Amino acid sequence: MKLSAIISLSVAGTVGTTAVVVPTTITLVNKTHQVEHESEQSDFQDIRFGLNSVKLPKAQPAAATRITVENGTDKLVNYKSSPQQLFLAKNALKDKLQGEFDKFLSDAKAFPALTADLQEWVDQQLFNPNQSFFDLSAPRSNFTLSSDKKASLDFIFRFTNFTESVQLLKLPEGVSVVVDSKQSFDYYVNASAQKLLVLPLSLPDYTLGLNYMFDHITLNGKVVNKFSFNPFKTNLNLAFSNVYNGVDVFEAQKNLVGKGKYLNTHVKAEDVKKDVNANIKNQFDIAKIIAELMGKALKEFGNQQEGQPLSFLKVMDKVKEDFEKLFNLVRPGLGKFVKDLIQSSSQAENKITVYKLIFDNKKTILNLLKELSIPELNSSLGLVDVLFDGITDSDGLYERLQSFKDLIVPAVKTNEKTAALSPLIEELLTQKDTYVFDLIQKHKGILTNLLKNFLADFQKSTPFMADQVAIFTELFDNEGAFDLFGEADFVDKIAELFLTKRTVKNGEKIETKDSLLVTSLKSLLGEKVAALGDLLDSYIFKNELLNRSVEVAKAEAKDTKGATDYKKEQAKALKKLFKHIGENTLSKTNLDKITLKEVKNTENVELEETETTLKVKKLDVEYKVELGNFEIKNGLIKAMLEFLPDTKDLETTLDKLLFKGESYKAMKDKYIKEGFPGYGWAKGVVPGAFESIENTFKSAIDKTKSIRDLFGDMLFGNDLSSVKETDSFITLGGSFDIKYGGENLNVLPAYYSLINSEIGYQIIGVDTTIDATKVKVELKNKEYKGKSPAINGQVKLSQSFFNVWTNMFDSITKQIFQKKYEFKDNIQVFARNEDNTSRLELDISDPEQRVIPFAFVDGFGIQLKAVDKNITKEAGNTEPKSPVIQLYEALNKEKDQKQQSKQSPKQLDTKTQLGYLLKLGDNWSKDDYKSLIDDTIINNNYLEASFNSKITVDRLGIPIDLWLFKIWPKFNLEIPMQGSLQLYSSSVIFPYGIYDTSVQDAAKIVKRLNFTDMGFKLNDPKPNFWFVGF
């Protein structure tokens, strides 16, 4: 039996009232006969597919209506200063959803769509389950929508048992009724006049659909609240683009935290104790494995025989098990994927194709994609299951993709974002036995351009990291970086990438840039070591071993006779350095000296809760890291000295260090004009005296020695040739303590980057202490033993430099390293069970638990702000400053004011400091902001270590030629060597990621902001000397 339920539309006499009336005489069709009582079939039309041609009235889905959330005060949401596309959670729109729905109801197409939903409910809930035994009619049917958009329902649906036996009638809400043969049962549906409520609906492509529901409805006498005829799909076709049917992280906090709520019921005290301790041990194990892995790899490169190229991937293949162990600690189950990835190369011993890599690790890859902060990916990840459905091996995966090749390739080519990748995609779809790193190497040109564009965008969005990002930008400025994944010799490629000047195209011009190492050093040092400027130029910035010039490279390529082969020298020095690090510094023997011991492990963790919070009542964890005389051997320092030039030009060095400084020139000019103190009458001998002093110093230079030898004298107190590489240079002994503590610490949810049912938790604002006051740093070379100093004579300058070095080392060690560091941080835990399933998992089918970690938090207004250009305009710079730099400058200004009295900068309260960063305006008093202020951490640290030493020469005899004879006056000479090492850092840690809109075209999500400034200052030496007799 089939039903033709007749719903016709009519407009009642009362103006503004629309009604739908279902006639009392409707078409009934049973197995044996058909009776038609009304000739209204002409108005019927089949508008749905697959329902056995069930005919419906002119109740139609509305044409698709999309509301795009845009920037601008006249739009639904004001994106403040960010014009690009951002993503919202539905809670950001608040009552705007209802407002847009109410406006939509005034549209002529709205009411037919409402009735279409009603008709589907009649079919699916009343007719379809009962059509085999019951006829269905509607003695009364009224659905009205008044001019003020209030809806009412008044329906009687009559079921008639047309069989010869008793039948079970199935009704909505799980109700069943027994109906005798030939008997009827009336089912009542009523709703008093009421405003229809909006019901958000999840749609693909990050779109929020709007459905509707009644606040309350009566189904056969039973009141049902929040009732929708079509809860999972609607014929309204009204939707918001770029809006997710979920909640942002701040709204989720309200839903998930508090007495009886998810986090409070699922995080137990014993979990916190176990997780915090596991977190410390895990981080320690990870650090040791990374160090040991690096040591093994560098040892392989260092022991490479000349003339036998050793590629990066061949060495990675040898240490793949270490990578597996490392990444399993980072995240259980990830290790196998990384190990397989390393083997996806034709250079690997056991090669793994791209398709086998994907097939064997599909679940891990899918989870990684989910965790990337790329909202566009999220809507298509569901297709992965379809792709793998029925596939049993990697060959099957290849054949499945082959069947889609004619669809995939054109789609890739026509998409602006993926068109450049089409050659790579085509090769991947054509060749079954291909490998990841072979593809990277072969298509390095494509990947270079993509990566350059990515880094350029990233640099725009991270102005406070401009220097660091610039290094990576320049590294991938040419295709050569991808040769690391080819068969090229790794050591040669490192020399080429990091120690060689680069030729780059800037518009129409070809420019030469410093090597990446020199670029980094210049960025780090800046103008803060002006006193050493000329020396840095000679030995670092213009050193061919660290900054091999294009001209030298060309001469080497032509094998020019007599030219120094700096490329070979670089490779030789790198291998020596790598070998020593691998065999000594990062050897397993040396690393095993460092151990972690538990002191306190939070034996009695207690959790407290209120209606809106979950707190750790008290946290008290302490671990001790014992260093066990960790050694840095002389060989490491000697290997580093190999990068200094071996030219014999110490006279030039002495000139630049002592006799070309402004202080020396000023003193010399003064004495020439005034004479020596107490000997003003003898002005005429002053120029000769200075000339003799300079000659005396220069005559003390051993002409066979280089700057390497002078550094050997200074650092080892011995001749380089006499220094044993296996002896200790520095030993690190004693221990340092790591402490986590605090009281009444908030516990909040923690999320991956994309929508994910798996979540973690974080303990906010943990007092973190690293107490290094018990660390013993011992410089082993404490006594000068050199028998053949680079600068000796009566000035004994090599020995003086050694004394300056030991004094500076002791000062910096005590003032910087042997200190107690205190700051706040969050402990974040993504706990897993033994079977690797998440211990905390939400039901993301529930929109209130579907958390959108990347949602723009409109309404909070807490995005980072761009500073007005007029405020920050400086010479040659009209760009707005990053907010974290503004914060840094404000606090640094206070630091400068305190510097004279050696006081630490005052720690401003969080609210004041956030005022530098966030667009909170007049909203500080709102309760919504209180949790943000309370749960944001700002750490500011300033450290300065000064050293004060001097070079002294007692009773230095200076020969001075007079007219008829020579005299030998004696002078005491003193050259102060003073300077300081300064470290300043500012970090801001938000409880959740928020959009940084400080750079208009490059908004991004940030959770942690860091600014670090380091400077080494060496004061211009101001020599002083005085006459002490003959």
Swiss-Prot record:
Principal subcellular localisation of the protein: membrane
Keyword entries, A-Z: Membrane, Transmembrane, Transmembrane helix
KW Transmembrane (keyword) present: yes
Entry membrane topology: Single-pass membrane protein
Cellular location(s): Membrane
Transmembrane domains' residue ranges: 7-29
Domain of life of the source: Bacteria
InterPro entries (alphabetical): MG075-like (IPR054689), P116 (IPR057145)
Annotated GO CC locations: membrane
Official protein name in the record: Uncharacterized protein MG075 homolog
